[in-house]
């Protein structure tokens, strides 16, 4: 049930989701501005706390992963980042937007210290698995703008957050 291949597959999916979710706002902001009655330059600062949390939060989440449970931390990652993306899609005020983006950053901060440690623990061919994991993270980066743009164009910016949050 907990085979190394299965665990590594979930960790790779998490890396994809981690980077994908952090960049939805960067693409969606183009259509969000007019919908919210705000200029691009007014919306940009709302992303900053989430990106700070994405980096700085890794200190706490790595510590928790070592002292508590990496597996449970990854469950929190999947549930938390999904709920946070849905929350962004439901915001009504700029303050709510900032809080929801901060939440994405906090949950995204779990992946790198915890997921990477899991790969090290489960991989037989560490270099190969780390390389593949890097590909999955970069696929999240590469696909975020395209998928967000398509969803935002046809369904609206809110769905660009809600759909991946549900998935």
Positions of the model-derived regions?
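Pair of pore-lining "gating" transmembrane helices in MFS-fold secondary transporters
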Residues: 2-27
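Helix-loop-helix hairpin linking two adjacent transmembrane segments in secondary transporters
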Residues: 133-167
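Cytoplasmic helix-loop-helix junction between adjacent transmembrane helices
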Residues: 100-138
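Interfacial helix-cap and linker-helix signal at transmembrane-aqueous boundaries
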Residues: 32-33, 64-65, 150-155
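Residue-level signature of mid-helix packing/kink "hotspots" within the transmembrane helices
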Residues: 23, 50-59, 141-142
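Extracellular/periplasmic helix-loop-helix junction of adjacent transmembrane segments
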Residues: 28-55
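Conserved MFS/SLC helix-loop-helix module at the cytosolic interface between two early adjacent transmembrane helices
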Residues: 56-92
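Paired small-residue
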Residues: 84, 95-103
